[in-house]
Amino acid sequence: MKCILALKALYEKRESAMKLGLFFHKFKKRILSMTQDRQPEITSECMQLLRLISEHYVGVFSSMEYVFLFQFVYAAYRPMATAAGELICKRLLAPPPQEGVFGQNPPDEFDRNIQNMKTLIDFYLQGEFHRHVPYLVDGLWDAAPALVRNWECMTALLLEPRGGRQALTSQQERVLIEILVAAVRQAAEGHPPAGRELGKRASREVDGTRRWRERASMSRHFVKVLPQLLSKFAADKEKVTPLLQIPQYCNLDVYDKDGLGSDLDSALLELDCLVQRHSDVAVLEACARAYGAYCCEGGSAHCQAAPACSRLVDMLVDALTPLLDVFLQHEKQGQFLGHHEMGRICSTLRRLVAFYSTHDLSSWNLYEKMDSLLTLRRHQGSMPTEVIHCALQCTYYALLWQIVAATDRLPPQVGEGLGGVRCGYG
């Protein structure tokens, strides 16, 4: 460690760095191998040393050696990941133009960020660490804030028309959405993803005022563009599902403070369309959680969102009731419904189950309807598996919400002891 720190001090000065060329070429392999040391503090200091060395010598590392070093942005130790992120910024991404170098026509900063984001997406796709987007974002969080926190750049790329000058491929869009959602989460929560170690000397305190301002700015941006994003990617469940997480991380009070009621209407309309369009469980559960964020009691979106959610559930229950009546009648007579009718029953039940997992639907008496189904199953002995499964899920959530309601009526001392029943729903 002492040797690395001493070398860092020398390489921070160009005069002394230029005298160490032969030394580095002799010990290059040894220094590179130290990035894999067992002590994380040594690996991060070594990565910072290599970044300094790369700034002084042209062509000092081969392309394969750079690829090897860049992958440490996914390291579990945050200082190491940040150091690798700094190297990525220096060697992979286009730097901001220096004053006077380009005369009167410097490159447009927005276009530069667009190109850097495309480069970052391709870097991720070419790597071997898929499913680690939050780690990549966190590794660049301090090294490239103008890139990974550039909401305008990311959403502009996603909203680029098909065939446009900056249009992405479908695979690039999917990765950018993952990057966007990971960055939104980190901006809202103020801490790295789970599993990333901060380091001994890292400050765990976050400037609350700065984070509040960043979140407010982020929220004002997304309440305007989220309806457009949901509309564009409505047909693609893999892309729209992560986008539906964004409302959970935004400060939705901006709807009231900034007079953005029409944007809220647009977001709720898109949610309604998604629920009616999709029957995939992941999409439906994401829609239910998004509605939950908008319907939060005391929030400025509650007055518009809660009635919209109730109307949607009304529509689903109204559609389900006659279907169930016909289904029960056929089952009692030993007859079978057609494939189309069974599909409608199952898809409607899936939608209601998704909402029941997040919202208290006790007012719609779904328990009684599900009890009728399960009673018939007990007597008749045959019923489609998915219908039984959905009926059991509805019954399960109905009972859980009754427990929640009973807990809320208990004295505080008793209710605190039962607080764990809320975990996983509500």
Q: What annotation goes with each model-predicted range?
A:
Residues 97-254, 364:
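Extended repeat-based solenoid scaffolds, especially LRR ectodomains
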Residues 1, 8-35, 53-80, 91-121, ...:
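HEAT/HEAT-like alpha-solenoid repeats
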Residues 3-14, 31, 35, 46-57, ...:
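Hydrophobic residues within the alpha-helices of tandem HEAT/HEAT-like
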Residues 1-4, 44, 82, 131-134, ...:
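Alpha-solenoid HEAT/ARM repeat scaffold
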Residues 278-320, 324-364, 377-381, 385, ...:
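Charge-patterned, phosphorylation-rich low-complexity C-terminal interaction regions
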Residues 30-38, 71-76, 117-125, 158-170, ...:
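Helix-loop junctions that connect tandem helical modules in alpha-solenoid scaffolds
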Residues 78-89, 148-189, 367, 371-400, ...:
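Hydrophobic, aliphatic-enriched repeat segments that assemble into extended interaction scaffolds
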